[in-house]
């Protein structure tokens, strides 16, 4: 992996708790990323931080390192009860909460601090059983946390650290009232360490967030470069009739190792999945109504390489740490210009190079001016030869719900086309 995204600043240069240093070095973390190097001097001195950095720059480890150091360096409140966690990390989605929990486990193993996880969808009793034994760091989504708090399974009166991750999405999804409800049940802002991290922070979000922070320091990485320097951006203008064939031709030509294809609706994602599955690709489907256990399984298959292509709505665009994604396709240009940044941020992570390809079709081309205004540059336009598009394509598979026995499963196809089936003659014109 490329190290060019790291700074000369080492974690060991900071006055971090020795167990935190041990946990970081055990996982191979020695040098800080820019956002970590900027944030840690403040958080380690007890100052609140609002951090903005593009996706994949180490925001999660910045706040986890700060959280564990703070808890190890400060005693628990006197009289703390079993149902009172010491730190609360709020995430907008179940998938992100699960990922943060996984990233925190190495720190927990070394330090002995206990983790809890609380998210909706399933696992209610399993999550509750862990909480009943007492946890130090509770990671979760607002709805399930409020549920537990109202039933007194969780009491927030001993919170010493609170983190809002992907804060802009928290507010965009309408969680403002939930967040305020939770904050009202914590100690005052000046009695805890507060951190807020996100790839994009609007003025509205900062104002709302700062209501619950204590004179926070604002730190940012590359504020004028909203898309990563290592991401090659490319744009095509297909007709609606040629759009699917262009996508399949580009996949055939690029033959990417690990790809995410974004579309704007569940039904469009299902259509793309059906065409690619029928064409022999190992493809997974991730939309909002996929059951939680299946979502986690699909993400695990994609991460392990058992699935090569993930077709997704924006549910997968925020916060998921999927390594080595080589390509992102915007089959539809997003309606929200900020989602463009989050989508293509799935590639080019941790110093690697990435490739983003967007299709500006007749339906969504009107979204392009707002996107280019937001990212501060025009996306390079490429041309293609209609006569060179693939034509020998099978009819798409149709998604069968509530199906048992044989047949295509929702969310996956296990047969990747062999390299021998690729056509060497299908090329796009420059």
From Swiss-Prot:
Sequence ranges assigned to domain Helicase C-terminal in this UniProt record: 245-390
Low complexity compositional bias, start-end: 402-423
Function of the protein: DEAD-box RNA helicase involved in RNA degradation. Has RNA-dependent ATPase activity and unwinds double-stranded RNA.
Lineage top rank: taxon: Bacteria
Main location: cytoplasm
Motif DEAD box per UniProt: ranges: 165-168
InterPro entries listed in its UniProt record: DEAD/DEAH_box_helicase_dom, DEAD_box_RNA_helicase, Helicase_ATP-bd, Helicase_C-like, P-loop_NTPase, RNA-helicase_DEAD-box_CS, RNA_helicase_ATP-dep_RhlB, RNA_helicase_DEAD_Q_motif
Catalysed reactions listed for this entry: ATP + H2O = ADP + phosphate + H(+)
Organism phylogeny: Bacteria, Pseudomonadati, Pseudomonadota, Gammaproteobacteria, Enterobacterales
Subcellular location: Cytoplasm
Domain spans labelled Helicase ATP-binding: 40-219
Subunit annotation: Component of the RNA degradosome, which is a multiprotein complex involved in RNA processing and mRNA degradation.
Protein name: ATP-dependent RNA helicase RhlB
Motif Q motif per record, residues: 9-37
Gene3D superfamilies the record matches: P-loop containing nucleotide triphosphate hydrolases (3.40.50.300)
GO-annotated cellular components: cytosol
Binding site for ATP: 53-60
UniProt keyword Lyase, yes or no: no
Record-level Gene Ontology MF annotations: ATP binding; ATP hydrolysis activity; RNA binding; RNA helicase activity
Family that this chain belongs to: Belongs to the DEAD box helicase family. RhlB subfamily.
């Amino acid at each position: 992996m490329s190290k060019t995204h790291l700074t000369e600043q080492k974690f060991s240069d900071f006055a971090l708790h020795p167990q935190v240093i041990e946990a970081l070095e055990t996982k191979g973390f020695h040098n800080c990323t820019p956002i970590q190097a900027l944030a840690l001097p403040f958080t380690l001195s007890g100052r609140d931080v609002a951090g903005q950095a593009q996706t994949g720059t180490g925001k999660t480890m910045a706040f986890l390192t700060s959280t564990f150091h703070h808890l190890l360096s400060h005693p628990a409140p006197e009289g703390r009860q079993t149902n009172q966690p010491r730190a609360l990390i709020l995430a907008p989605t179940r998938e992100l909460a699960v990922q943060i929990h996984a990233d925190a486990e190495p720190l927990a193993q070394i330090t002995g601090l206990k983790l809890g996880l609380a998210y909706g969808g399933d696992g209610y009793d399993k999550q509750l059983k862990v909480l009943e034994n007492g946890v130090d760091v509770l990671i979760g989504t607002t709805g399930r946390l409020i549920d537990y708090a109202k039933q007194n399974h969780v009491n927030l009166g001993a919170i010493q650290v609170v983190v809002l991750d992907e804060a802009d999405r928290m507010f965009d999804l309408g969680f403002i009232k939930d967040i305020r409800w939770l904050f009202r049940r914590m100690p005052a802002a000046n009695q805890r360490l507060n951190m807020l991290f996100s790839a994009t922070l609007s003025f509205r979000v900062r104002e709302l967030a700062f209501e619950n922070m204590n004179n926070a320091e604002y730190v940012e990485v590359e504020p004028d470069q909203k898309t990563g320097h290592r991401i090659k951006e490319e744009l095509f203008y297909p007709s609606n009739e040629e759009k699917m064939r262009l996508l399949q031709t580009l996949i055939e030509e690029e033959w990417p190792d690990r790809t995410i294809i974004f579309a704007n609706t569940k039904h469009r994602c299902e259509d793309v999945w059906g065409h690619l599955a029928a064409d022999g690709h190992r493809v997974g489907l991730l939309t909002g109504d996929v059951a939680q256990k299946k979502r986690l399984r699909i993400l695990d298959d994609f991460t392990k390489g058992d699935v090569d292509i993930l077709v997704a709505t924006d549910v997968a665009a925020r916060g998921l740490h999927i390594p080595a994604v080589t390509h992102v396709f915007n089959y539809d240009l997003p309606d929200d210009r900020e989602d463009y940044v989050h989508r293509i941020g799935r590639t080019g992570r941790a110093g690697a190079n990435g490739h983003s390809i967007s299709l500006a079709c007749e339906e969504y081309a009107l979204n392009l001016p707002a996107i280019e205004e937001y990212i501060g540059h025009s996306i390079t336009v490429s041309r293609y030869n209609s006569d060179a598009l693939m034509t020998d394509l099978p009819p798409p598979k149709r998604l069968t719900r509530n199906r048992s026995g044989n047949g295509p499963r929702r969310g996956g196809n296990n047969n990747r086309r062999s390299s021998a089936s690729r056509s060497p003659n299908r090329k796009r014109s420059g």
